[in-house]
Amino acid sequence: MKKDYYEILGLTKSASKDEIKKAYRTLAKTYHPDVNKETNAEEKFKEITEAYEILNDDVKREQYNQFGHAAFDPNAGGFGGQNPFTNAEGFSGFSDFSGFGSIFTDFFGGFGNSQRANPNRAQRGEDRHAVIKISFIDSVLGKEIVEPLEKFETCNTCNGSGAKSQSDIITCTQCSGMGEQIKITKTFLGQMQQNVICSKCNGIGKEIVEKCLICKGKTHTKTTKNITIKIPAGIQNGQTLRVENYGNAGLNGGSNGNLILSIKVSPHKHFVRKNNDIILRLPVSIKSVIGSEKVEVPTPYGFEIIKIDPNIKTGDELIIKNKGIITKYESGKMIVIFEIFIPKLTSFEKKEISTILEKNADKFYEKWIKEFE
């Protein structure tokens, strides 16, 4: 015959929940198998835990006070754990018809014997996302950035259990460690039994009496570390980089998620990227054109010196190889588009130029205009 639960904890029926919890903690620390090496310590610890799980739950305590141990004995009749789909002749409802299994599992979430994913399995944490802004030049040349990043690590105090001590981890008092509860749903077919995740333990089957003082039951702590992020040369706007293990914390010993960084490249005032080429509109004075002068062409890698062809006009292009986007697969080019401009002149300078030009007939224009006659 089982011993009275109140007697096991050394309490009376009028004991408050605080008194029940205090009595359990005291006895659990005394008889925990990791601490007490006596032969009957483990059995005594299980007995104490069972008593606490019943008396700490208001519904179960009320049932125990009214019916005693018979309230939780499936063979005692009354309100035991009988399957509502089983009748006196042994008919087991829809479970005999395999064709209905998947249909009703999808529709109602599964019957009492349906399997569910193990909530205690290791689960990888979710990825976190952030945007990092870089300059156009940094996107071409690449760069290393040192950033302080938050990282979740297993709590060293509780070793990831979330509890103040091992004795604070008990079987869930609501689902008795099953991780599930039976829910009865009324449908057009009648009452249907459905297994749902326990709302108290979220399907884990365990609950914590007193949480870890450091992580507050979260099983992990948050630290900040300076991490070097390598921006590869040639990266494009919208591309992503991955920083492993800097995402959200995993569950049940699962690995952290990753930090996904989306690259946002700030536009340059003069350089424009087209695939792996860089386009530059270069203003050139008419003086430099006439005199076929040398001018500097800016590139992301420094300045290039070119000699102006005296025959160029606005819109003409010059290709400079290997001065575009350079990746391990391809070396882009710089495309220079000339824009000829006339500098500001004084009245005297304009008169001198007019005198010079009057001596030279504009044969190109004369030929062009005759095409319309």
Swiss-Prot record:
For this UniProt record, give its keywords in alphabetical order, as a comma-separated list: Chaperone, Cytoplasm, DNA replication, Metal-binding, Repeat, Stress response, Zinc, Zinc-finger
User: Which residues are recorded as binding Zn(2+) 1?
Assistant: C155, C158, C212, C215
Q: How is the cofactor bound?
A: Binds 2 Zn(2+) ions per monomer.
Function summary: Participates actively in the response to hyperosmotic and heat shock by preventing the aggregation of stress-denatured proteins and by disaggregating proteins, also in an autonomous, DnaK-independent fashion. Unfolded proteins bind initially to DnaJ; upon interaction with the DnaJ-bound protein, DnaK hydrolyzes its bound ATP, resulting in the formation of a stable complex. GrpE releases ADP from DnaK; ATP binding to DnaK triggers the release of the substrate protein, thus completing the reaction cycle.
Record note on domains: The J domain is necessary and sufficient to stimulate DnaK ATPase activity. Zinc center 1 plays an important role in the autonomous, DnaK-independent chaperone activity of DnaJ. Zinc center 2 is essential for interaction with DnaK and for DnaJ activity.
What protein family does this chain belong to?
Answer: Belongs to the DnaJ family.
Q: What is this protein called?
A: Chaperone protein DnaJ
Species of origin:
Mycoplasma mobile (strain ATCC 43663 / 163K / NCTC 11711) (Mesomycoplasma mobile)
- Which gene is annotated as encoding this protein in its UniProt record? dnaJ
